């Protein structure tokens, strides 16, 4: 029977992480459990930087972006000797289980700790929406709103100058954020990691649009596919249309979480504690068809590639 739990946020921050921490803390306290917050993710676990949390520790946190516990990327945590020190720190505090909020890298750490005797439940927190076992991740909808607002602003200036604008969106190997933002923002062209990309083909599509009378256009592209500044120069040379690239960058991770992210994070935080109380470990929570679900972290990591929303792309192309 667990009496104390710890909670940490790891990897890239995402709007709604504070709401998830709040969900964990308030639910645990309602079940008469003690809760410890761990600063800066697995790094704080290794350095033994923890603090006991009460209900007031998470007051006025549901609407705040980022994570008040801090986060860090700590590659050394993959080393057995580093994790052993972290486990010792957990045991010194008599913490019985952990809730880990983050992306796939955080999942790996949680699985390793579970295998070392520390029960863990993971919550998907990343704007990339690239974690399997869930329809949506915490932070995705807020980032989507941010990207669409940026596209709206770019369209204002692009239309004024009859310009082609390229907007680079986060997502790593997953195009969910780019695709959804492109549909909502009315982008004329979409470049995703899930589909074959050739700059020559993109130019042909753009030229076809110009031939139809298109005076300006927005190209939405997921990060890491190509150098967008070089792409802008190439498009401008081939089309004789002024072309500019905008990299949205880390602004996509900031800001107060939108309503859906607050609700999702609160539900996932509460559900993770409920699973620990029932004796589950090595699980990751998710939402599917608006219902809370859980899967083995190990299975989620084996099947990390999400199903590509091909039907969304087909719809988007019809709307050009």
Curated annotation (Swiss-Prot):
Enzyme Commission number(s) of this protein: 2.7.1.11
Activity regulation text: Allosterically activated by ADP and other diphosphonucleosides, and allosterically inhibited by phosphoenolpyruvate.
Main location: cytoplasm
Enzyme class: transferase
Nucleus is among the record's keywords: no
Pfam families associated with the record: PFK
Residues involved in substrate binding: 126-128, 163, 170-172, 223, 244, 250-253
GO terms of molecular function: 6-phosphofructokinase activity; AMP binding; ATP binding; fructose-6-phosphate binding; identical protein binding; metal ion binding; monosaccharide binding
Residue pairs linked by disulfide bridges in the UniProt entry: none
GO-annotated biological processes: canonical glycolysis; fructose 1,6-bisphosphate metabolic process; fructose 6-phosphate metabolic process
Catalyses which reaction(s): beta-D-fructose 6-phosphate + ATP = beta-D-fructose 1,6-bisphosphate + ADP + H(+)
CDD domains: Bacterial_PFK
Subcellular location: Cytoplasm
Needed cofactors: Mg(2+)
UniProt pathway annotation: Carbohydrate degradation; glycolysis; D-glyceraldehyde 3-phosphate and glycerone phosphate from D-glucose: step 3/4
Binding residues annotated for ATP, in chain numbering: 12, 73-74, 103-106
GO cellular component, one term: 6-phosphofructokinase complex
Residues that coordinate or bind Mg(2+): 104
NCBIfam families: PFKA_ATP, PRK03202.1
Family indicated by similarity: Belongs to the phosphofructokinase type A (PFKA) family. ATP-dependent PFK group I subfamily. Prokaryotic clade 'B1' sub-subfamily.
Purpose: Catalyzes the phosphorylation of D-fructose 6-phosphate to fructose 1,6-bisphosphate by ATP, the first committing step of glycolysis.
UniProt xrefs under HAMAP family: Phosphofructokinase_I_B1
The name this protein goes by in its record: ATP-dependent 6-phosphofructokinase
Origin species: Buchnera aphidicola subsp. Acyrthosiphon pisum (strain APS)
Gene: pfkA
């Amino acid at each position: 029977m667990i009496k104390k739990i710890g909670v940490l946020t790891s990897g890239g921050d995402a709007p709604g992480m504070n709401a998830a921490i709040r969900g964990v803390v308030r639910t645990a306290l309602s079940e008469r459990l003690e809760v410890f917050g761990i600063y800066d993710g697995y790094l704080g676990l290794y350095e033994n930087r923890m603090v006991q949390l009460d209900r007031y520790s998470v007051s006025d946190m549901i609407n705040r972006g980022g994570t008040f516990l801090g986060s860090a990327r700590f590659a050394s945590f993959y080393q057995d000797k580093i994790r052993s020190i972290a486990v010792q720190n957990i045991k010194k505090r008599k913490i019985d289980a952990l809730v880990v909020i983050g992306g796939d890298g955080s999942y790996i750490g949680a699985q390793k700790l579970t295998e070392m005797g520390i029960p863990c439940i993971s919550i998907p927190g990343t704007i990339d929406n690239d974690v399997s076992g869930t329809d949506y991740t915490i932070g995705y909808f807020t980032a989507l709103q941010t990207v669409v607002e940026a596209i709206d602003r770019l369209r204002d200036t692009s239309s004024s100058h009859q310009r082609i604008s390229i907007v680079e969106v986060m997502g790593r190997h997953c195009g969910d954020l780019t695709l959804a933002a492109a549909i909502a923002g009315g982008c004329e062209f979409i470049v995703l990691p899930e589909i074959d990309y050739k700059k020559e083909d993109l130019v042909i599509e753009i030229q076809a649009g110009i031939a139809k009378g298109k005076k300006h256009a927005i190209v939405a592209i997921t990060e890491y596919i190509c150098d967008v500044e070089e792409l802008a120069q190439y498009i401008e040379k081939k089309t004789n249309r002024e072309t500019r690239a905008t990299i949205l960058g880390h602004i996509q991770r900031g800001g107060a979480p939108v309503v859906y992210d607050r609700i999702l994070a609160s539900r996932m935080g509460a559900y993770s504690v409920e699973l620990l109380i029932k004796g589950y470990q090595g699980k990751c929570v998710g939402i599917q068809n608006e219902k809370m679900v859980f899967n083995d972290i190990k299975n989620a990591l084996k099947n990390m590639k999400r199903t590509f929303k091909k039907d969304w792309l087909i719809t988007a192309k019809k709307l050009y």
